[in-house]
């Protein structure tokens, strides 16, 4: 049997918060701030957004490794935060996250239409998240009431290593029966999610405006003056440079056009690993 390069995409693997739901990715960021505050440690929204896309325990560990936050922790507890301390914060974070996830569960404008168009082009819809399974159960149920059902969902604690490792994306490939990683496109609003797709050998699409990096509500995004939006886009594109996304678009509403372009590139023999 000979190897044949894929001629078209077979699946889109979509992130959740900031990509399909929760414009601005507010649900996780605000809860990180609140969880640290319950331990007497101040963390700003901007700081909380930094590692977004990682699994939530890893996210908290990364925050605790930031020198300024570590020093604030030392000022309260007289020591630097250990893994046990990270687990304690995580265990406070989880019930807060489950309790408040519904407050930021609205679908991103244009998401349903874009996903329907992808299905019309023959793509399966996989998905993964930095949320653990106990949170994803609620996120998935809320999305279903709004009309969105992915073909497969992989939570961060359902694989040995979460983002930026490729395990969640590859778990989707296996579950969806995709025969080539180059026939997949990974869509995410964070650099760990783009690295995940890159390391899995997939096409990657970074979202510059709907998610964590811009950090605004849809209404605030719509109201931004053109010059300010352009400055923000430039800043966010620079933030993504290290993860090397194949495409950058503002929101998932623009994804069908990207899929058509990728299909044209595949038909010409191009592969994601070579770009």
Curated annotation (Swiss-Prot):
Q: What up-regulates or down-regulates this gene? A: By 2-aminoethylphosphonic acid.
Cofactor annotation: Mg(2+)
Record GO biological process: DNA repair; organic phosphonate catabolic process
Q: Does the keyword Cytoplasm apply?
A: no
Signal peptide bounds: none
Regarding protein family, the annotation reads: Belongs to the HAD-like hydrolase superfamily. PhnX family.
Identification of the protein by name: Phosphonoacetaldehyde hydrolase
Q: Upper taxonomic classification of the species?
A: Bacteria, Pseudomonadati, Pseudomonadota, Gammaproteobacteria, Pseudomonadales
Q: Which gene encodes it?
A: phnX
